[in-house]
A protein has these predicted regions:
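Intrinsic-disorder/low-complexity, polar/charged segments
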Residues: 110-126, 284, 292-296, 392-399
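Extended amphipathic alpha-helical scaffolding segments in membrane-proximal extra-membrane regions
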Residues: 204-345, 349
Length: 424
Protein backbone atom coordinates (compact mmCIF):
# COMPACT_ATOMS: atom_id res chain seq x y z
CA UNK A 1 0.00 0.00 0.00
CA UNK A 2 1.23 3.49 -0.79
CA UNK A 3 2.25 5.67 2.11
CA UNK A 4 0.10 8.61 3.13
CA UNK A 5 1.07 11.55 5.32
CA UNK A 6 -1.68 12.68 7.62
CA UNK A 7 -2.40 15.13 10.37
CA UNK A 8 -3.94 13.43 13.36
CA UNK A 9 -5.68 14.48 16.58
CA UNK A 10 -6.76 11.78 18.98
CA UNK A 11 -8.37 11.52 22.39
CA UNK A 12 -7.70 8.44 24.53
CA UNK A 13 -10.55 8.07 27.01
CA UNK A 14 -11.33 6.09 30.16
CA UNK A 15 -13.31 6.32 33.39
CA UNK A 16 -13.38 5.25 37.03
CA UNK A 17 -15.81 5.58 39.93
CA UNK A 18 -15.17 8.65 42.07
CA UNK A 19 -16.37 10.18 45.31
CA UNK A 20 -16.77 13.80 46.36
CA UNK A 21 -16.45 16.91 44.23
CA UNK A 22 -13.15 17.45 42.45
CA UNK A 23 -11.27 20.50 43.72
CA UNK A 24 -8.51 21.67 41.35
CA UNK A 25 -4.99 21.34 42.73
CA UNK A 26 -1.52 21.68 41.25
CA UNK A 27 -1.74 22.34 37.51
CA UNK A 28 -5.38 21.36 37.15
CA UNK A 29 -7.61 24.20 35.93
CA UNK A 30 -11.38 24.28 35.76
CA UNK A 31 -12.79 24.91 32.29
CA UNK A 32 -16.18 26.39 31.49
CA UNK A 33 -17.94 28.40 28.81
CA UNK A 34 -19.23 31.95 29.11
CA UNK A 35 -22.91 32.86 29.16
CA UNK A 36 -22.66 34.19 25.61
CA UNK A 37 -21.03 30.94 24.45
CA UNK A 38 -23.73 28.95 26.21
CA UNK A 39 -26.43 31.01 24.54
CA UNK A 40 -24.81 30.58 21.13
CA UNK A 41 -24.40 26.85 21.66
CA UNK A 42 -28.06 26.57 22.64
CA UNK A 43 -29.01 27.80 19.17
CA UNK A 44 -27.65 24.55 17.76
CA UNK A 45 -28.04 22.09 20.64
CA UNK A 46 -30.93 21.56 23.04
CA UNK A 47 -30.43 23.85 26.07
CA UNK A 48 -30.78 20.94 28.49
CA UNK A 49 -28.03 19.08 26.64
CA UNK A 50 -25.78 22.14 26.79
CA UNK A 51 -26.51 22.48 30.49
CA UNK A 52 -25.69 18.80 31.03
CA UNK A 53 -22.28 19.34 29.43
CA UNK A 54 -21.45 22.74 30.91
CA UNK A 55 -23.80 23.31 33.84
CA UNK A 56 -22.89 23.77 37.48
CA UNK A 57 -25.29 21.37 39.22
CA UNK A 58 -24.90 17.78 40.38
CA UNK A 59 -26.46 16.44 37.19
CA UNK A 60 -24.00 18.11 34.83
CA UNK A 61 -20.40 17.49 33.80
CA UNK A 62 -17.58 19.56 35.33
CA UNK A 63 -14.33 19.77 33.36
CA UNK A 64 -10.76 20.19 34.56
CA UNK A 65 -7.72 20.36 32.28
CA UNK A 66 -4.00 19.99 32.81
CA UNK A 67 -1.72 21.18 30.03
CA UNK A 68 1.10 18.76 29.22
CA UNK A 69 2.70 20.35 26.16
CA UNK A 70 5.33 17.68 25.57
CA UNK A 71 6.54 15.84 22.50
CA UNK A 72 7.13 12.25 23.57
CA UNK A 73 8.71 9.59 21.33
CA UNK A 74 6.64 6.42 21.08
CA UNK A 75 8.44 3.31 19.92
CA UNK A 76 6.57 1.27 17.32
CA UNK A 77 7.50 -1.71 15.19
CA UNK A 78 9.73 -4.62 16.08
CA UNK A 79 13.30 -5.64 15.41
CA UNK A 80 14.78 -3.89 12.40
CA UNK A 81 11.48 -2.04 11.86
CA UNK A 82 11.51 -0.50 15.36
CA UNK A 83 11.36 3.29 15.27
CA UNK A 84 10.28 6.24 17.40
CA UNK A 85 7.33 8.39 16.37
CA UNK A 86 7.20 11.90 17.82
CA UNK A 87 3.86 12.26 19.57
CA UNK A 88 2.56 15.59 20.83
CA UNK A 89 0.76 15.21 24.14
CA UNK A 90 -1.29 18.38 24.45
CA UNK A 91 -3.32 17.93 27.61
CA UNK A 92 -5.38 15.68 29.84
CA UNK A 93 -8.92 16.50 30.90
CA UNK A 94 -11.05 15.18 33.73
CA UNK A 95 -14.83 15.11 33.35
CA UNK A 96 -16.58 14.80 36.69
CA UNK A 97 -19.93 13.37 35.70
CA UNK A 98 -23.11 12.59 37.67
CA UNK A 99 -23.57 9.38 39.67
CA UNK A 100 -19.97 9.26 40.85
CA UNK A 101 -18.22 8.76 37.51
CA UNK A 102 -14.94 10.42 36.55
CA UNK A 103 -14.10 10.32 32.85
CA UNK A 104 -10.80 11.47 31.38
CA UNK A 105 -9.27 12.10 27.97
CA UNK A 106 -5.67 12.35 26.80
CA UNK A 107 -5.23 14.57 23.75
CA UNK A 108 -2.43 13.59 21.39
CA UNK A 109 -1.32 14.90 18.00
CA UNK A 110 0.65 13.34 15.15
CA UNK A 111 1.95 14.34 11.74
CA UNK A 112 3.28 11.17 10.16
CA UNK A 113 2.49 8.29 7.86
CA UNK A 114 -0.82 6.51 8.35
CA UNK A 115 0.90 3.30 9.40
CA UNK A 116 2.65 5.06 12.26
CA UNK A 117 -0.65 6.56 13.41
CA UNK A 118 -2.31 3.20 14.02
CA UNK A 119 0.90 1.83 15.57
CA UNK A 120 1.11 4.70 18.08
CA UNK A 121 -2.58 4.49 18.99
CA UNK A 122 -2.37 0.72 19.39
CA UNK A 123 0.58 1.17 21.75
CA UNK A 124 -0.89 3.98 23.86
CA UNK A 125 -4.45 2.72 24.29
CA UNK A 126 -3.22 -0.48 25.99
CA UNK A 127 -2.78 1.23 29.30
CA UNK A 128 -1.51 -1.83 31.17
CA UNK A 129 1.71 -1.88 29.10
CA UNK A 130 2.59 1.81 28.97
CA UNK A 131 4.69 1.84 32.13
CA UNK A 132 6.98 -0.80 30.63
CA UNK A 133 7.04 0.45 27.04
CA UNK A 134 7.09 4.22 27.55
CA UNK A 135 8.11 5.42 31.00
CA UNK A 136 8.17 9.05 29.90
CA UNK A 137 4.53 8.92 28.77
CA UNK A 138 3.60 7.16 32.00
CA UNK A 139 5.29 9.85 34.11
CA UNK A 140 3.90 12.79 32.13
CA UNK A 141 0.33 11.56 31.61
CA UNK A 142 -0.57 8.57 33.76
CA UNK A 143 1.05 9.88 36.94
CA UNK A 144 -1.27 12.94 37.19
CA UNK A 145 -4.26 10.72 36.45
CA UNK A 146 -3.18 8.24 39.12
CA UNK A 147 -2.84 11.06 41.63
CA UNK A 148 -6.42 12.10 40.88
CA UNK A 149 -7.45 8.46 41.20
CA UNK A 150 -5.80 8.15 44.62
CA UNK A 151 -7.52 11.32 45.82
CA UNK A 152 -11.02 10.68 44.49
CA UNK A 153 -11.52 7.04 43.51
CA UNK A 154 -13.84 4.88 45.56
CA UNK A 155 -11.31 2.06 45.25
CA UNK A 156 -8.11 3.99 45.98
CA UNK A 157 -7.27 1.83 49.02
CA UNK A 158 -7.20 -1.28 46.82
CA UNK A 159 -4.08 -0.16 44.94
CA UNK A 160 -1.85 0.16 48.01
CA UNK A 161 1.27 -1.89 47.38
CA UNK A 162 0.36 -2.70 43.77
CA UNK A 163 2.85 -2.59 40.91
CA UNK A 164 2.56 0.47 38.68
CA UNK A 165 1.26 -1.63 35.78
CA UNK A 166 -1.64 -2.96 37.84
CA UNK A 167 -2.34 0.48 39.28
CA UNK A 168 -2.65 1.98 35.81
CA UNK A 169 -5.24 -0.59 34.80
CA UNK A 170 -7.54 0.86 37.48
CA UNK A 171 -7.86 3.98 35.32
CA UNK A 172 -9.85 1.81 32.92
CA UNK A 173 -12.38 0.50 35.40
CA UNK A 174 -14.68 -0.75 32.66
CA UNK A 175 -12.73 -2.70 30.04
CA UNK A 176 -9.08 -3.35 29.24
CA UNK A 177 -8.15 -0.48 26.95
CA UNK A 178 -8.87 3.18 26.35
CA UNK A 179 -11.64 4.33 24.04
CA UNK A 180 -10.43 6.45 21.12
CA UNK A 181 -11.94 9.43 19.31
CA UNK A 182 -9.71 10.36 16.38
CA UNK A 183 -9.58 12.87 13.54
CA UNK A 184 -7.25 12.11 10.63
CA UNK A 185 -6.93 14.52 7.70
CA UNK A 186 -4.82 14.64 4.55
CA UNK A 187 -4.35 16.78 1.47
CA UNK A 188 -5.93 15.68 -1.79
CA UNK A 189 -2.48 15.09 -3.23
CA UNK A 190 -1.87 12.32 -0.68
CA UNK A 191 -4.95 10.27 -1.64
CA UNK A 192 -3.89 8.98 -5.04
CA UNK A 193 -3.82 5.19 -5.24
CA UNK A 194 -5.15 4.69 -1.71
CA UNK A 195 -8.57 3.18 -1.01
CA UNK A 196 -10.09 5.52 1.57
CA UNK A 197 -12.63 3.00 2.87
CA UNK A 198 -9.90 0.46 3.54
CA UNK A 199 -7.83 3.11 5.30
CA UNK A 200 -10.83 4.20 7.38
CA UNK A 201 -11.43 0.58 8.38
CA UNK A 202 -7.80 0.14 9.43
CA UNK A 203 -7.79 3.39 11.41
CA UNK A 204 -11.08 2.52 13.10
CA UNK A 205 -10.02 -0.98 14.06
CA UNK A 206 -6.51 0.25 15.00
CA UNK A 207 -5.08 -2.35 12.66
CA UNK A 208 -1.76 -2.09 10.81
CA UNK A 209 -2.21 -0.03 7.66
CA UNK A 210 -2.20 -2.41 4.72
CA UNK A 211 -3.75 -5.25 6.70
CA UNK A 212 -6.79 -5.30 4.40
CA UNK A 213 -4.54 -6.95 1.82
CA UNK A 214 -5.62 -10.63 1.59
CA UNK A 215 -1.97 -11.65 1.91
CA UNK A 216 -1.71 -9.95 5.32
CA UNK A 217 -2.08 -12.05 8.48
CA UNK A 218 -4.55 -9.48 9.88
CA UNK A 219 -6.72 -9.31 6.76
CA UNK A 220 -10.43 -9.19 7.73
CA UNK A 221 -12.99 -11.46 6.14
CA UNK A 222 -15.10 -9.84 3.44
CA UNK A 223 -18.28 -10.50 5.43
CA UNK A 224 -16.91 -8.71 8.50
CA UNK A 225 -15.51 -5.82 6.48
CA UNK A 226 -18.78 -5.33 4.60
CA UNK A 227 -20.84 -5.49 7.79
CA UNK A 228 -18.70 -2.87 9.50
CA UNK A 229 -18.50 -0.51 6.55
CA UNK A 230 -22.18 -0.85 5.61
CA UNK A 231 -23.59 -0.58 9.11
CA UNK A 232 -21.26 1.77 10.98
CA UNK A 233 -20.19 4.45 8.50
CA UNK A 234 -21.37 8.05 8.51
CA UNK A 235 -21.08 9.63 5.08
CA UNK A 236 -22.60 13.02 4.31
CA UNK A 237 -20.08 15.09 2.34
CA UNK A 238 -17.59 14.05 -0.30
CA UNK A 239 -14.52 15.19 1.61
CA UNK A 240 -14.95 13.09 4.75
CA UNK A 241 -16.36 9.87 6.13
CA UNK A 242 -16.61 8.62 9.72
CA UNK A 243 -16.70 5.16 11.27
CA UNK A 244 -18.41 4.58 14.62
CA UNK A 245 -17.30 1.40 16.41
CA UNK A 246 -17.44 0.07 19.96
CA UNK A 247 -13.88 1.08 20.87
CA UNK A 248 -13.27 3.96 18.46
CA UNK A 249 -14.89 6.80 16.58
CA UNK A 250 -12.85 7.77 13.53
CA UNK A 251 -13.12 10.77 11.21
CA UNK A 252 -11.12 10.58 7.97
CA UNK A 253 -11.18 13.56 5.64
CA UNK A 254 -9.19 15.56 3.14
CA UNK A 255 -8.84 19.31 2.69
CA UNK A 256 -10.67 19.97 5.96
CA UNK A 257 -10.55 23.51 7.35
CA UNK A 258 -9.17 24.18 10.83
CA UNK A 259 -12.55 25.61 11.82
CA UNK A 260 -14.28 22.38 10.85
CA UNK A 261 -11.75 20.32 12.80
CA UNK A 262 -12.26 22.53 15.84
CA UNK A 263 -16.02 22.00 15.56
CA UNK A 264 -15.49 18.24 15.63
CA UNK A 265 -13.23 18.56 18.67
CA UNK A 266 -15.34 20.95 20.73
CA UNK A 267 -18.82 19.71 19.84
CA UNK A 268 -18.82 16.21 18.39
CA UNK A 269 -16.12 15.02 20.76
CA UNK A 270 -16.37 17.47 23.67
CA UNK A 271 -20.14 17.27 24.01
CA UNK A 272 -21.67 14.33 22.13
CA UNK A 273 -18.97 11.66 22.41
CA UNK A 274 -18.18 12.46 26.04
CA UNK A 275 -21.86 12.33 26.99
CA UNK A 276 -22.28 8.99 25.18
CA UNK A 277 -19.18 7.58 26.88
CA UNK A 278 -20.66 8.65 30.20
CA UNK A 279 -23.86 6.74 29.40
CA UNK A 280 -21.89 3.66 28.35
CA UNK A 281 -19.69 3.70 31.45
CA UNK A 282 -22.77 4.23 33.64
CA UNK A 283 -24.39 1.15 32.07
CA UNK A 284 -21.18 -0.83 32.65
CA UNK A 285 -21.28 0.06 36.34
CA UNK A 286 -25.02 -0.52 36.65
CA UNK A 287 -24.56 -3.98 35.19
CA UNK A 288 -21.77 -4.63 37.71
CA UNK A 289 -23.92 -3.37 40.61
CA UNK A 290 -26.73 -5.67 39.51
CA UNK A 291 -24.88 -8.86 38.58
CA UNK A 292 -21.74 -8.79 40.72
CA UNK A 293 -22.55 -6.64 43.76
CA UNK A 294 -26.19 -7.85 43.86
CA UNK A 295 -27.53 -4.49 44.96
CA UNK A 296 -31.27 -4.19 45.56
CA UNK A 297 -33.15 -4.07 42.27
CA UNK A 298 -35.67 -1.51 43.52
CA UNK A 299 -32.87 0.89 44.52
CA UNK A 300 -31.14 0.40 41.16
CA UNK A 301 -34.39 1.14 39.33
CA UNK A 302 -34.88 4.33 41.34
CA UNK A 303 -31.36 5.41 40.38
CA UNK A 304 -31.94 4.41 36.77
CA UNK A 305 -35.10 6.51 36.59
CA UNK A 306 -33.19 9.50 37.94
CA UNK A 307 -30.41 8.90 35.42
CA UNK A 308 -32.88 8.66 32.54
CA UNK A 309 -34.62 11.87 33.60
CA UNK A 310 -31.51 14.01 34.07
CA UNK A 311 -28.77 12.46 31.91
CA UNK A 312 -30.38 10.66 28.99
CA UNK A 313 -30.99 12.52 25.73
CA UNK A 314 -32.77 10.81 22.86
CA UNK A 315 -32.09 13.89 20.73
CA UNK A 316 -29.41 16.52 21.31
CA UNK A 317 -29.57 19.01 18.46
CA UNK A 318 -31.87 20.97 16.18
CA UNK A 319 -29.64 20.22 13.18
CA UNK A 320 -29.40 17.04 11.13
CA UNK A 321 -25.62 16.44 11.26
CA UNK A 322 -25.19 16.49 15.07
CA UNK A 323 -28.28 14.26 15.33
CA UNK A 324 -26.79 11.85 12.80
CA UNK A 325 -23.43 11.80 14.60
CA UNK A 326 -25.15 11.31 17.95
CA UNK A 327 -27.15 8.29 16.82
CA UNK A 328 -24.15 6.75 15.06
CA UNK A 329 -22.21 6.94 18.34
CA UNK A 330 -25.13 5.34 20.21
CA UNK A 331 -25.19 2.50 17.72
CA UNK A 332 -21.42 2.07 17.68
CA UNK A 333 -21.27 1.88 21.48
CA UNK A 334 -24.33 -0.42 21.50
CA UNK A 335 -25.98 1.77 24.10
CA UNK A 336 -29.67 1.34 23.32
CA UNK A 337 -29.57 -2.47 23.32
CA UNK A 338 -27.70 -2.68 26.62
CA UNK A 339 -29.87 0.00 28.23
CA UNK A 340 -33.15 -1.70 27.32
CA UNK A 341 -32.06 -5.22 28.25
CA UNK A 342 -30.47 -4.14 31.51
CA UNK A 343 -33.55 -2.20 32.55
CA UNK A 344 -35.73 -5.20 31.69
CA UNK A 345 -33.59 -7.60 33.75
CA UNK A 346 -33.53 -5.30 36.78
CA UNK A 347 -37.29 -4.73 36.54
CA UNK A 348 -37.89 -8.49 36.36
CA UNK A 349 -35.68 -9.03 39.40
CA UNK A 350 -37.57 -6.30 41.26
CA UNK A 351 -40.92 -7.95 40.43
CA UNK A 352 -39.58 -11.34 41.52
CA UNK A 353 -38.33 -9.90 44.79
CA UNK A 354 -41.68 -8.24 45.44
CA UNK A 355 -43.51 -11.50 44.74
CA UNK A 356 -41.15 -13.36 47.04
CA UNK A 357 -41.70 -10.73 49.74
CA UNK A 358 -45.46 -11.03 49.28
CA UNK A 359 -45.23 -14.81 49.53
CA UNK A 360 -43.19 -14.61 52.73
CA UNK A 361 -45.71 -12.18 54.20
CA UNK A 362 -48.60 -14.43 53.21
CA UNK A 363 -46.88 -17.40 54.80
CA UNK A 364 -46.31 -15.41 57.97
CA UNK A 365 -49.96 -14.36 58.07
CA UNK A 366 -50.98 -17.97 57.44
CA UNK A 367 -49.02 -19.24 60.44
CA UNK A 368 -50.29 -16.39 62.59
CA UNK A 369 -53.79 -17.32 61.51
CA UNK A 370 -53.22 -20.94 62.50
CA UNK A 371 -51.86 -19.89 65.88
CA UNK A 372 -54.83 -17.61 66.42
CA UNK A 373 -57.17 -20.37 65.30
CA UNK A 374 -55.83 -22.83 67.85
CA UNK A 375 -56.26 -20.22 70.56
CA UNK A 376 -59.77 -19.49 69.31
CA UNK A 377 -60.69 -23.19 69.37
CA UNK A 378 -59.99 -23.45 73.10
CA UNK A 379 -61.84 -20.20 73.80
CA UNK A 380 -64.80 -21.30 71.68
CA UNK A 381 -64.89 -24.69 73.39
CA UNK A 382 -64.95 -23.04 76.80
CA UNK A 383 -67.75 -20.70 75.67
CA UNK A 384 -69.87 -23.55 74.33
CA UNK A 385 -69.25 -25.55 77.52
CA UNK A 386 -70.56 -22.66 79.60
CA UNK A 387 -73.65 -22.27 77.39
CA UNK A 388 -74.30 -25.97 76.89
CA UNK A 389 -72.45 -28.06 79.47
CA UNK A 390 -70.82 -30.91 77.57
CA UNK A 391 -71.28 -33.40 80.41
CA UNK A 392 -75.03 -32.73 80.34
CA UNK A 393 -75.53 -32.91 76.56
CA UNK A 394 -72.73 -35.22 75.46
CA UNK A 395 -71.96 -37.10 78.64
CA UNK A 396 -68.30 -36.05 78.60
CA UNK A 397 -66.48 -32.70 78.66
CA UNK A 398 -63.62 -34.24 76.68
CA UNK A 399 -65.93 -35.35 73.86
CA UNK A 400 -67.50 -31.90 73.78
CA UNK A 401 -64.20 -30.08 73.44
CA UNK A 402 -63.10 -32.59 70.79
CA UNK A 403 -66.28 -32.09 68.72
CA UNK A 404 -66.04 -28.30 68.83
CA UNK A 405 -62.33 -28.40 67.94
CA UNK A 406 -62.81 -30.72 64.96
CA UNK A 407 -65.75 -28.69 63.66
CA UNK A 408 -63.95 -25.36 63.87
CA UNK A 409 -60.70 -26.72 62.41
CA UNK A 410 -62.62 -28.27 59.50
CA UNK A 411 -64.33 -24.93 58.85
CA UNK A 412 -60.99 -23.11 58.90
CA UNK A 413 -59.44 -25.72 56.58
CA UNK A 414 -62.29 -25.35 54.07
CA UNK A 415 -61.97 -21.57 54.22
CA UNK A 416 -58.20 -21.74 53.59
CA UNK A 417 -58.65 -24.10 50.63
CA UNK A 418 -61.31 -21.88 49.08
CA UNK A 419 -59.14 -18.78 49.55
CA UNK A 420 -56.07 -20.40 47.95
CA UNK A 421 -58.21 -21.71 45.06
CA UNK A 422 -59.60 -18.24 44.32
CA UNK A 423 -56.07 -16.73 44.26
CA UNK A 424 -55.06 -19.22 41.57
Amino acid sequence: MNTMLMKYTGFLCGAFSAKGRFVPYGNWQGTAISDSERELCSNFYYPEFVDFNYGANKNSISRFTMEIGQVIPVEVGHGEDARNVSTSVHSITLYQAPFGLMLFSIRIGLQCEAGDVTAVVARLRNIDLIHKTNRRFADAVLAPLMEAYRRYSRSARDIAGMDDDLCHTRLVEYGNKLKVFQIATTDSSEREGIDQDELLFELGTVAPVGSYDPENDFSPSKAYYDRIMDGNCVSVFNNWKALSLFDTFTFLGHDISEGNIENWISNYFGMIYISELFVKFYLFRLNNDFRISHKRADKLLEQFDEFEYSCWFDQVSYNFLPRLIHHSMEEGLEILTEKERLYQMIAQQKDKREKDDDQRMNNLLFYLTLFTTFSMVWDAGSLFNEMYPFETYLGSATEGFRLVSYTLLLAVLILIILTRFKKR
